[in-house]
Structures are given as C-alpha cells and as structure tokens.
Amino acid sequence: MKLAACFLTLLPGFAVAASWTSPGFPAFSEQGTGTFVSHAQLPKGTRPLTLNFDQQCWQPADAIKLNQMLSLQPCSNTPPQWRLFRDGEYTLQIDTRSGTPTLMISIQNAAEPVASLVRECPKWDGLPLTVDVSATFPEGAAVRDYYSQQIAIVKNGQIMLQPAATSNGLLLLERAETDTSAPFDWHNATVYFVLTDRFENGDPSNDQSYGRHKDGMAEIGTFHGGDLRGLTNKLDYLQQLGVNALWISAPFEQIHGWVGGGTKGDFPHYAYHGYYTQDWTNLDANMGNEADLRTLVDSAHQRGIRILFDVVMNHTGYATLADMQEYQFGALYLSGDEVKKSLGERWSDWKPAAGQTWHSFNDYINFSDKTGWDKWWGKNWIRTDIGDYDNPGFDDLTMSLAFLPDIKTESTTASGLPVFYKNKMDTHAKAIDGYTPRDYLTHWLSQWVRDYGIDGFRVDTAKHVELPAWQQLKTEASAALREWKKANPDKALDDKPFWMTGEAWGHGVMQSDYYRHGFDAMINFDYQEQAAKAVDCLAQMDTTWQQMAEKLQGFNVLSYLSSHDTRLFREGGDKAAELLLLAPGAVQIFYGDESSRPFGPTGSDPLQGTRSDMNWQDVSGKSAASVAHWQKISQFRARHPAIGAGKQTTLLLKQGYGFVREHGDDKVLVVWAGQQ
C-alpha cells in the first residue's frame, strides 16, 4: 500500500529540493523517484553513521548490517557505530517511497560475482537461426519451439528454426515430448494481481452497498463494480494466460464512507482497493457474499489456480461520516438542526460547497472529544492523534502511516473487541478471553483459510508490524490450510503448505529477516527499473537474470513490472512479456499488463491512474496480439519449473542471446535472435 495522497502534503518532503548527506560521503544523487545514492571509498575501521536531510538528523534504528534494509529514525544522543571489516567502495542507498526512510549499505566486490557474456546487443537479419544445442538436447532429439510449435531434430548438435513473426525474435525450446505443465512450484509461480473492484462486474446489484455512490465526476476514487463473481467469470481467461495464482485485493469489509482524495481534495476516495479494513470477519458487500467467495475459490482450484488474499494488520481505515453516523462514534462541532442542515439526512451524501473541497468534511468533526472517540476502536486497539488515544510514535512500528490509525499489534494487553463493534450487529467477531489485537487479527484472517481453503496471503506494509506477528499469522494460517485440505481432499490441489509473500518498500533480492519470520517470498522492488533498461535489448537482462537465478536457489522473491503503488510499465509494448515471464523466481502480472491497460484519471493523486478499469474491449480488439504473446510465454513458463526455479547458464551463440535454465529433470533453452 502506498500513502494516501490526500495526506502526502503533511509528510516530510523527502523527494523535494533538499539533499541527503552523510559524513564522509558526497551529496546523494536521486536515482528514480524517492531513491537516493552515494558512494565513498572508506578504510577498514569503526565510524559513527548518521544521515541528514533538510536539517533533520537520521540514524539506523537497528544493528548496522550490509545488504539489509535498515529503518531510519530521528537521531538520539549517541550515534550508532558502523564497523567496516575491510577497505572498499561503500554505497549508501536511501529509499523514501514508503513515507519513512530506509537505508541499504553495500560494498563493491573486488570482482564482479557474475560477468555477462553479452558485450553489445546482437543484431538479427530476420533469417532462420542455427542454434548449437549440443549441451542441452541429445543428438537425434526432437526439439520444439513452444512459441511457433515448430519441431526440429538435433543434427550434429544443432537445430535450425525460424522465430515466429509475432515472437519478438524468441525461440522457447523444449523437448518435443513435453505435453503437459509440470507440477506447481511457488518458485515458478505466475501470480496475477487484481484490484477486484476495477476488474469485472459480475453482480451489479451490489454496486452501491452501504450507501456508496458515484461522484458524477471522473469516478477516480469511487467503487466501480468489480466483485468476486466477476473474478469467477474471468477464470478461464486467466487459465489461458498461464496464471497459476490469483492475488485479489483484500475482500474484507472496508470503511463504508469516503475521505478526501488527492492533495487537493478534488474527489471522494472510497476504500475500493481494500486497504482500509473495518471488519476482518465480514466480506465487503461490494465484493459479494460468502457463496460468491466459495464459488471463486473452488472454481479457481479446479483450474489449477491458487487464491491469495491481500491482508493488512498494520492499520485500520479512517473515520468517515458514514461510519460515525451508523456506529455512533466520534463527535461533531454541530448540534441540533445544524447537523441535518450541514450534513443532510445521510451524512455520507455530503458534498463540498463553493470554496470547499472533499477534505472540508473534517471541519465539522471534533477530533478532540475524548468521550465520543472512546466509542470508536478503543485505546487498547489503536494509537492515533484523535481524542484521548495514545499518540503514534516516530519509528516504523508505532508510526501512524499516512495518518491511518496504527493497530497495537505489539501489545500484550487483552483488548476485548473493538468498542464500536457493540453497535455493529452484523460482525462475526466474538470476544475471546485474553486475546490481544494481534491475536484477534491472526485468528480472524486464518479463519478464512480454514473455511475456504485460501492458499496464501500477500502481506501489506510488512515493515510496519513487528516480525513475531507475521510468524504468528503464518503459523496459524498454515495450520488452518492443513485442516481444510484434510477436510476437503477432493478440493485440495496438492499438499503444498500455506504461502506468504510480503511488501516491504525497497526490498530486493536478499534473504532478509522476513524469511525467518514466516515469509516465503518478498516483493522485489528492484526489478521494475532493471527491466526498463532492457526494453530495447533483452540481452541486457543477462547479468540480472544470472544473479537472480544463482541467489534464488535458497529463497524466493516476487518480481513485477507494474503495480498500483508505483507505475504502469508500458515501455516496449508486448516485449514486457518476456522481460517479466522469463525472470527467475515468482513473478506478478498486474491486471492489464498483458493488454496495455491505459492509465486512468488521477486528479491530484497520480497513483490513482494505475488503478483504471480493466480494458476488456481491447483484449479481443487492438490488444489481441499482445495478449496472445503473453499467453504463449506464460504457458511455456507454467510447463517448466526450470524457468523460475532453475540455475542459468548463458550461452555464447553465433547469433543472438541465449540461456539454459535447469531444475531437476527439467531443462529449457531460450534464444532471442536480436534487434532487427
């Protein structure tokens, strides 16, 4: 989850005119939005480590380690000591995209760990390719190009094939006797991420649940109608796309109303994305009902597709007029007839008048009224600057991210249920003696696994919750999935355990502490820009792919090109397919990557444009060729675990760029002919 744009103006301006500095390092240079880098030659020894930005001093919050993501906090009296074990060129990289800065320290190795065999981008004249396959396929073997379905017989260690006209010069080579997809492996997963509300409307009757409605403008932050039934309707499409895991936005009940959207408050922002949860025991009515969810999960499993829920344990949603009125918490500055006159019969129908914005509803709310706000979540559940609640802290674990109420997941005090649940008659939450907020959250979330056979979670804002909480979630969800599979042997896809991946801004291909606390993979934030540098020459991915294939023999990452929190990757047209789908490790397609879904309206929040409606009209229209290209490469990936899980050997070819990936008995050879 990215920070809500309506609050960005209140955060430190990490990405503006001021520059980061650190003693002993030259001024940092910006490398992409929100990331800053500086290099320095340093001697072996011990030195203090502090960083400065706009007269604010920052220091690592934890022990200083190389190649680890370190959270930064305001400086205390004693700066931490950094022990340098050898002379070398050190790099400091600061990432501010999550709203709180993080630091990564690395050192230049004496020799490159992996040297690319590609010196310049190969050129191709469009003629058939003669490929030496002697080290991959035996003499006399029948080798198939999966893309074109051509078959060639290995003769004198070589084959000759013509890349298909629509393949961008690719040959996807496998043994011709390969006739089915291999058993599923999370290291080779192709995950399709959808914001359910923006994908497909399968049930228009639920579009205006809880009194939600359109804004009559650009509909930037309103609910658009996508739901669980719509997802089920498109499972055949996803299966044809080679998808074997579907990550859906959190389907739990969200705040019912809206908050002001964008820095200018120029649109109402509803929780269509699933990141402002209000009740983890209910489905949001806009998403559908429990029968819809069961049908989705069962139908997906029948097609070999796993279901992942997006989950949030760091924060709740904002207070909205709709929820204040319905659940009787909070306080207004208005009284008597003033309430109806200013807000109307139904408060959520309020609209800004001349001179007001969608932020202006806050002017009617008395955020200091202790009695009124005690009726909301309660002090045992959250910290926030509202009422008599404990104030948020300044570190990653206790801060109020984008001014969202921070859940006290670290608390060891029994909390009872959220206070306003007393007025929420439809909740399935039951009080459990001794339970803390963390206990309730992990119990509620794992219950969805136990009831429906959910295969995994994608964890939002992982760095803002203490690691033991994630381990607790993984342990409980894993037990729940085992129970479900035992009770539903006819529905279970296999005996694979519960899978969990997480979002920690700036995380790359490194085996961090998250992997020791329940996570099977972390989202790879580095891959988007690495791929952008290779859109004109696939061979330029060689070093990145070699390094990933080598490192990922011991762990896994989830790499992406586009996301709802960064940008849509539209460079190179359908070349994005091979850039993503041939990557080592698990990969994530963001809905519409395959069909070049257009950027949508944004107002004063540029991220909103990444969440546009799925362009179904283009799938069978102007983007049909692109979709077919994605399908072929993704289906090839699904047939071969070696692509995601295998070791890579780069080949020195007379023409083009090529590599072999090998995992167990599975072996493939991929050739890119070169630029035409």
UniProtKB/Swiss-Prot annotation:
Q: Which GO terms describe its cellular component?
A: outer membrane-bounded periplasmic space; periplasmic space
> Is Signal one of the keywords?
yes
Describe how expression is induced or repressed: Under the regulatory control of the MalT protein.
Task: Detail the disulphide connectivity of this chain as listed in its UniProt entry.
Answer: C57-C75, C121-C537
Which region is the signal sequence? 1-17
Protein origin, superkingdom: Bacteria
Keywords from the named record? Calcium, Carbohydrate metabolism, Disulfide bond, Glycosidase, Hydrolase, Metal-binding, Periplasm, Signal
> Subunit structure of this entry?
Monomer.
Q: Could you identify this protein by its name?
A: Periplasmic alpha-amylase
Q: What is the organism field in this record? A: Escherichia coli (strain K12)
